[in-house]
């Protein structure tokens, strides 16, 4: 299926669907399952240098929500609401394990990457060095984990300042010579184009956007929060928000910065939508948590069917919409159009 082939900069991918970091890929078995399902690559469950971030996993909890915000386990689930923590495994041991899996994956044109959820610059540099020594090819630096505001102090840090981000990425870049360095940004900032450009100046090979949002869901039966706390919230509803920032970032970088879309992909059509806005690949996780690893196979198959029907290659989509995006001032005037979207009483004569 060469029409699915893509790349993130100079790094080739057999298709644009990557399994994102999370609980499904916290074991070697889970990573292999994602690869068997056809994923172009897997971002293995994240680490950092803070024991508190790993301990947080013992307090993790999860809920799938329907469109009305009600907890559900059925097909109506459209959003994942959860709090989480990092893998409870020695960093060197974990990186050795996933490096072996990466070597296996490379024989099939796929990859397995290391990931860190940022806590400190020194820690990120040290962890990145361990990933390089383990022989891994891709390192994801996640500076946008939504849980930062709720986690124990210092366990997780969210970076939203462009100057600090540039300095951080430059340090990590120095520790990852010869590796792909992908920086994952927060969804809790309107400054994503500036943050993306800062990451690029620091030496990032690609930028992923965007992390989930923090939310609070009241349970109308108990009058208490679902899961007992605020938690990270993402779903298909987020896709238009992600698409807008992908397009704005592609424009800010004049197409020079490879982009990875994440948060909201539930179908092959969603992959195509993010591609049109500039994403050369996407990361999926919530769909896997809800539907199993078969969700990866389904999404890839749906995308391939779409491309075949349209007579296109995936690369034809990347940035096509973003490069032609217009603003409000570019639109034709349509006086009275508002009348089509109000109740009839609004238009009655007094």
What residues fall within each predicted segment?
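C-terminal helical cap(s) of enzyme catalytic domains, especially alpha/beta-barrels
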Residues: 51-71, 217-235, 275, 287-312
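Glycine-rich phosphate-binding active-site loops on the catalytic face of alpha/beta enzymes
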Residues: 44-50, 140-147, 206-216, 264-265, ...
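Alpha/beta catalytic cores of nucleotide-metabolism and tRNA/nucleoside-modifying enzymes
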Residues: 234-256, 268-350
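Active-site beta->alpha loop and helix N-cap motifs at the rims of alpha/beta catalytic domains
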Residues: 68-162
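Glycine/Thr-rich beta-alpha phosphate-binding loop at enzyme active sites
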Residues: 80-88, 146-163, 195-255
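Catalytic cores of alpha/beta
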Residues: 28-34, 122-133, 189-202, 249-255, ...
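Short beta-strand/loop segments at the ligand-binding rim of alpha/beta enzyme cores
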Residues: 11-18, 106-114, 174-186, 250-262
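Glycine-rich, positively charged N-terminal anion/phosphate-binding segment
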Residues: 2-7, 28-106
């Amino acid at each position: 299926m060469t029409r699915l082939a893509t790349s993130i900069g100079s790094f080739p991918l057999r298709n644009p669907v990557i399994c994102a970091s999370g609980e499904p890929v916290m074991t070697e078995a889970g990573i292999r399952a994602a690869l068997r399902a056809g994923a172009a690559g897997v971002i293995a469950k994240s680490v950092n240098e803070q024991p508190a971030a790993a301990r947080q996993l013992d307090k993790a909890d999860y809920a799938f929500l329907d469109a009305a915000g009600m907890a559900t386990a059925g097909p109506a689930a459209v959003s994942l609401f959860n709090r989480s923590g990092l893998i409870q495994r020695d960093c060197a041991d974990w990186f050795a394990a996933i490096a072996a899996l990466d070597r296996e994956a490379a024989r099939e044109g796929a990859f397995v990457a290391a990931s860190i959820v940022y806590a400190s610059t020194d820690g990120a540099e040290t962890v990145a060095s361990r990933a390089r020594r383990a022989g891994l090819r891709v390192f994801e630096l996640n500076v946008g984990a939504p849980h930062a505001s709720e986690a124990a102090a210092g366990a997780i840090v969210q970076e939203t300042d462009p100057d600090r981000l540039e300095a951080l990425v430059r340090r990590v870049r120095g520790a990852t010579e010869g590796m792909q360095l992908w920086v994952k940004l927060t969804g809790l900032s309107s400054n994503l184009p500036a943050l993306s450009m800062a990451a690029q100046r620091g030496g990032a090979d690609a930028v992923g956007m965007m992390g989930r949002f923090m939310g609070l869901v009241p349970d109308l039966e108990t009058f208490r929060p679902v899961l007992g706390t605020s938690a990270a919230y993402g779903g298909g509803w987020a896709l238009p928000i992600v698409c807008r920032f992908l397009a704005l970032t592609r424009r800010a970088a004049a197409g020079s910065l490879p982009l990875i879309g994440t948060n909201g992909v539930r179908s092959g059509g969603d992959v195509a939508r993010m591609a049109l806005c500039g994403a050369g690949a996407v990361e999926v996780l919530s769909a896997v948590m809800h539907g199993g690893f078969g969700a990866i196979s389904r999404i890839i198959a749906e995308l391939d069917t779409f491309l075949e029907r349209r007579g296109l290659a995936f690369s034809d989509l990347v940035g096509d919409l973003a490069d032609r995006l217009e603003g409000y001032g570019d639109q034709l005037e349509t006086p009275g159009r508002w009348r089509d979207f109000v109740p009839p009483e609004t238009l009655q004569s007094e």
